[in-house]
Amino acid sequence: MIKPESSPPAEKAAASALKRGRTRAWAWWVAAGLALAVILSGYVRCFTKYGDLTPLIRFGSEFDATVVPSIRAQPHHVQNGDGFDGQFYTQLGTDPLLLKPETPVAMDNTSVRPRRIMLPVLTWLLSAGGQAWLVLWVYPLLNLAAWLALGVVTWRILRPMGNDVAVGAFLAIVLGPGAVESASRAVTDLPAFMLAFLSLGIAGYGGAVVLSLAALGRETTLLAWPGRMGELARWPTSWRRWLLDGAISVAPLAVWMVSLQLRFGSGGAGVDGGNLGLPLSGLFTRLKEIASHLSAQPVASVSDLLLHPAIQCGLLIVSVLTQLIFLLKNPQRNDALWRWGVLAGTLGLCLGWATWEAFYTVTRHLLPLHVAFNLLLVRSENRAVWFWLIIGNLHVLPRVLYWVDFH
């Protein structure tokens, strides 16, 4: 009887590759399950503790007297102080065109808040014409929908790459602090970012229409427009097309802003909403604050260390600078995401103290930089890819812990 020959090297290599492929497939499903569990955890914790999702909206006691009557009549959580921006966008969900006299009175700024009309209009449509009890549920859940969309799109982009770095980048993007910050404060950044992100993959003027909707959610998403301009070498022969594309992207926001200016004036804020300052001024001011925070608030445990404001801010600064340095060090000028990420990172250096004071607000502005860094890192041939991945995402874990422990 002839004994079967052992498998040749090629077959062994194929079997080994198949085994690694199965391992990667399981890793992807585990990563997806982990990401979904983290995303839902904050919402579940909020609901089980308060009975609804209004703590995410962050109504503040300082504005309680001016809340629109339809919202005031509904049970909702009110925190001490001035709350946060989501409270104004939620109220716009009952009257997005500000046709009722009480709506402008409820705004802290009649220029900036109504300018970002996209989510309030969507809330109004999904809440049967602005039914207040539905608005209080629909509005905070729009960030959940955008968050899940980010996960699906990122999964579809990264999974075919089939390597371990891609799994890490997937988790870093989906659980990134910009997404956490947008969801935990029920603001417009993540939904607007997702529309702008999707516009990069839509050819023709349809993509410009989608980008115009994103701009009505957050003006800075217009920084994605250069990413729609194709290869740089073709710009001179396509300038008429790109000008029309840009006009379509900008026109709805421009018309709406002019309308608000004519109706309500400047509202006490400039075009930037008070977010910008001299380059690096906000960053340097925040660096000075880190030392004083460390001395004022002692660290008692590892958890305290990760959640310590000064430590979180320090990790955030290191991560953001690492991401921007990587993109500048590895230029891909014909890549849509690279252009958007670099422009967003440059804008981030010009954010003033009004943004850096609540320092994780910065991560919402820098969502394009964060996503571009992680996606382009996976595609790069850099030998130190794991070093860049870890250092560029040091700020992810502290915000994940904050979200999971939402209170």
Features from the language model and the residues they span:
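Membrane-lumen/periplasm interface segments of specific transmembrane helices
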Residues: I39-P55, P226-L232, S238-G345
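Short hydrophobic/aromatic helix or loop-helix immediately within or flanking a transmembrane segment
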Residues: G83-P101, A106-Q131, P368
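Membrane-embedded glycan-lipid processing machinery
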Residues: S111, R115, L126, L134-A145, ...
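Transmembrane-helix motifs of polytopic, lipid-linked glycan transferases
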Residues: V121-L125, L141-M161, L321-F326
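Transmembrane-helix signature of polytopic, membrane-embedded enzymes
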Residues: W133-W137, T154-L175, F193-M194, D335
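Hydrophobic, aromatic-rich transmembrane alpha-helices
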Residues: G151, D304-N334, L349, L367-R379, ...
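Specific aromatic-rich, kink-prone transmembrane helix
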Residues: V153, L171-I173, P191-G207, A372
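Membrane-interface alpha helices of multi-pass inner-membrane proteins
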Residues: A196-F197, Y205-E231, S249-A251
